[in-house]
Regions:
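Flexible, compositionally biased loop and terminal segments
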Residues: 1-232
Length: 232
């Protein structure tokens, strides 16, 4: 079983432009792919899946009407998530990481918290969403936390374990496979920089709304193929 797959679901807006649709429709189609992955992937092949739902730049630099649509869509999607039978029959725990408590409207915060609380005792699989998240901001906050701890306790040993415990992702294992859709073969704003230090990367030109479960399976097959080569 793969312990942890992270997905940067890029290309929703490009898909919308190509198909003559609105950005909102692009995000909606992307959510359909997320649903498909959730329904099919937690079958004993993957333990943890993390989706990057919104960066800080997404929330700060995009037009306000688009940001408000994002908030509305997140609220709708998370409510729908809790109705999936797979979430409950497969005991999938939902986590939401990032600065959503600082940035999101209260109603959306309430919906997110309900999803977290409703699944907190599930332990077979973990479904994580990064919302209001940038990797460089995560690391800056970790450094600030460690600095404050060191001031309070000069004898504190600063090591890799302490850094990990200071991250949003402190309860998650390192990322084994990072998938990025949308034809952008690079990382962005330090995405999960600590947890992807030894990850395999899988880049595809396919925009996320066209990233079917078949394409997801291809990424997993390639990951295992690379692993076999490395083991020789």
């Amino acid at each position: 079983m793969i312990e942890h797959i992270a997905i940067i679901p890029d290309g929703n807006r490009r898909w919308a432009q190509t198909n003559g649709s609105s950005p909102e429709q692009g995000h909606l189609e992307g959510f359909e792919r997320t649903k498909e992955i959730i329904e099919k992937a937690f079958d004993g092949r993957v333990k943890n899946i993390t989706f990057w739902g919104a960066s800080l730049d997404n929330l700060a630099k995009r037009p306000q009407d688009e940001v408000q649509h994002l908030y509305k869509n997140f609220q709708t999607y998370i409510k729908i998530l809790l109705t999936y039978k797979e979430i409950h029959t497969k005991k999938i725990r939902i986590n939401v990481l990032g600065m959503w408590k600082e940035l999101f409207p209260e109603m959306l915060q309430s919906v997110i918290q309900k999803a977290i609380d409703s699944t907190k005792d599930y332990s077979n699989y973990t479904l994580n969403f990064l919302l209001g998240y940038n990797g460089d901001e995560e690391m800056l906050q970790a450094i600030q936390s460690i600095s404050e701890q060191k001031l309070a306790n000069p004898n504190l040993e600063i090591n890799a374990d302490l850094v990990k415990q200071s991250l949003y992702t402190k309860y998650l294992p390192p990322v084994d496979l990072l998938i990025r859709t949308g034809g952008e073969p690079h990382n962005s704003v330090g995405f999960m920089m600590w947890d992807t230090a030894n990850s395999q990367y899988y880049f595809t030109d396919i925009n996320y709304p066209d990233f079917t479960i078949h394409e997801f399976d291809k990424a997993i097959i390639e990951y295992h193929t690379r692993g076999k080569r490395e083991g020789k």
